[in-house]
Amino acid sequence: MKVLIQRNNRQKLASKIAAASFIKQGIPSNDILFLEFENNILLKSKVGKKYLRKGKIKIFKDDLQSFTLLRFLGPEFIEYKEKILIIDPDVFALQNPNNITSFLDNYNSLACTFIDGEPRTEVMLVNA
């Protein structure tokens, strides 16, 4: 399983600390990759553009959370080859996460957390 940490220039320090927490829990450093906002031409081209979110018009900003949409590019980033854990840069490992892959099977290729019955995307496990 690869761990993909999404980030932008404002979140580099946090993402390095997150990576270190996964390494400390036994994930090899070569299994930790960064999804970089600054390297994504498509997302960068959308800065300043309008989009619809929850029924309201918003402007896409290059801000603290500009990396958010990178999470949906994780499977393509690893060429659809394996299971991946996609996390925000402020998510840290308190134990080795390898056992969570058991949430995925032939019927479930995506797992995430829920808050108040709503799916969250800060931590997503994907069978790419």
Per-region residue spans from a language model:
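Glycosyltransferase catalytic domains, chiefly GT-A lineage
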Residues: 1-128
